[in-house]
Amino acid sequence: MESDDCQVLASLIRWESSLGGLIDAANRCDRHEGPSVRLDRDAVREVLQRCISGELDVLKLPRWAGAIHMLDRVEIDEVDVDVLTQFLFEMSSTELFEPITVDVCQRWISRMGHA
């Protein structure tokens, strides 16, 4: 069961299928004890690239980021915690920052490469 939990959380991090189903499954898993999964820059850059290419809907990025940001069992390495926490906060709080566009995604990819 624990490996299934990790797989659901990892699938959400990689945004592998319908976002609604992934978020619901990840929220159910997050309520139970189990191992954490890591969010890293590579995973975020991959999702951003897929939003830029049109494979993923860039307008759903705030929902994805907010879901990940709220999960207790998603961890971020200390070296990446500042930039990825800021990314998740800004992406999930578009009312406080700018609307999500392809240009915003491209800027974040660049920023993560230099942070």
Language model region names:
Residues M1-A115:
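Acidic, Ser/Pro/Thr-rich low-complexity regulatory regions
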